[in-house]
Amino acid sequence: MGEVKKRSLFSWLLFDLANTVYAFIIPGLYFSVWLVSEKGWTDQQLGLATSSAMIIVAILGPWVGKKSDSSEGKKKLLLTMTLLCIISTFLLGTFSVEISVLLFVISLIGFNLGSVVYDALIVSVSNNDNRGKISGLGVAFGYTGSLIGFGVATLLQNNGYSYEEIFKSVALLFLIFSLPAFFFIDEKIVSSKKIKTSILNSLNIVIKSWKHSRQYEGLTRFLVGRFFYADAINTLISGLLAVYLVEEVGLTPADSQNILALAIVVSIIGGYIFGKLADIYGPRKLILTSICCWIISLSLAIIATEFNQLWLIYVTGVLGGFNIGGIFAVDRVFMTRLSPEEHLGEFYGLYSTVGRFATILGPILWGLIVNTLSLSRNVAMGSLIILLVISFMIIKDVSDKERF
C-alpha cells in the first residue's frame, strides 16, 4: 500500500475514532444520564427526543446517500454534517434544558447523516479481499475513541468539571480527530454524473431507492433483518443502557461507567476479530453468531437483576461489548457484497434509514413498557430479545456471496 493510500486509510480510521467519541459520550452516556438523573426527564421523554431525530435522519438518509454518489463526491457532505454535529454538541447545556434537547436532536441528525457518507467511503480505502479487515479496524479505532472520550470525561468529572464542560470537550475531540479525513482521504469517485435533486424530494427518493434495492438479490431482506437487530442494539446504546444500569440494576454512575468501559475494551477486540473472520467465512455467519450472543447477553442481564447476581452484569458487559464491535464491523461488509459500487451511497442511505427507524421504534417501545404500562425495565429488555430472534430468522437465508 502506497504512502498516500496509507494516509487515506489512517484518516478514514481516525474519523471512526472521532465520531465514536461523540456516540459513546453524548447519546450513549453523559447526556442521557444528565437529562434523566440530573434534570428529571423520563426514559420516555429521552426516547422521544432520540426518535424525533431518527425520523428526520430516516427521511434524509437516502437523499444524502444518493447525493454522495454524484461526481461532487462524499467529503463535502461529510464535512457539512460533521460540523453540524460538532457545533450543536459544543452548545449543549449552554441554554435551557429544552434548548439543549433541541441541540441534542440536531447533533444526532448531523452525526447519523455523516455516518451514511462515512460508511460508503470504505470502498475508497479497501478492496474486496481486505474489506472485512478494514471495517473491523474501523470499529476497533472507533471504540478506542470511546476509551479516549471516556477517559477525558471521567478525568474532567473527577476534577469537578460540569456536564456542560464535558460536552464541550467531546465536541473538541470530535473536531480534532475528524480533520485528517477532510484533507487526506483519497476518495474514489465512481460516478461522473451530477445529481440535482431537492432535499424536499427526499421521501420520493426513499421510495425509489427501496424499489431499486429489490433488483439486487438479498439486499432488501438483509435491510429488513438489520432493522430488527439494530432496533435492539441501538435502543441500548442510545442512552437507555446507562439509565438501566443506574435505575434498574442499582449501580452508581461510577460503577455503570466502569462496566461500559470494560465493554469498550472488548469491543475493540471484537471488531477486529470479527472483521478478519468475515474475510474468511463471510459476513452472514458472523452476524448470526453475534445475534445469538446478544440474545444470551440480554438474557443474562435480566437474570442478574431478577436474582441479584450482579457479577453477571460484568459477564454481560464483556459479551455485549465483544459483539457490538463485531456486528457493526461485519454488517458494513455485508452491505458492500450486496450493493454495486455506483449505488453504494444510495443503498447506505437505506441502511441508515433502517437503522434510524429502528432507533425510533426501540426507545418508544421501551418508554411504553416502562412509563406507560409501568412495567420493569427487565420486561423492556425482554422485548429486545424478541426483536433479535426475529432478525435471526430473516437473515439466516440471505446469501453473502460476492456479486460485484
Can you name each region flagged by the protein language model?
Residues 156-172, 368-388:
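A membrane-interface helix-boundary motif in multi-pass transporters
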Residues 2-54, 218-259:
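Helix-loop boundary and gating motifs at the non-cytosolic
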Residues 113-126, 326-339:
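Intracellular juxtamembrane helix-capping segments at the cytosolic ends
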Residues 1-9, 188-224:
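Juxtamembrane intracellular "pre-TM" segments in multi-pass secondary transporters
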Residues 60-73, 270-283, 370:
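Helix-to-loop junctions at the C-terminal end of transmembrane segments
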Residues 48-66, 261-273:
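Central cavity-lining transmembrane alpha-helices of secondary-active solute carriers
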Residues 79-97, 293-307:
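C-terminal ends and interior cores of transmembrane alpha-helices
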Residues 133-154, 352-362:
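Glycine-rich segments within core transmembrane alpha-helices of 12-TM secondary carriers
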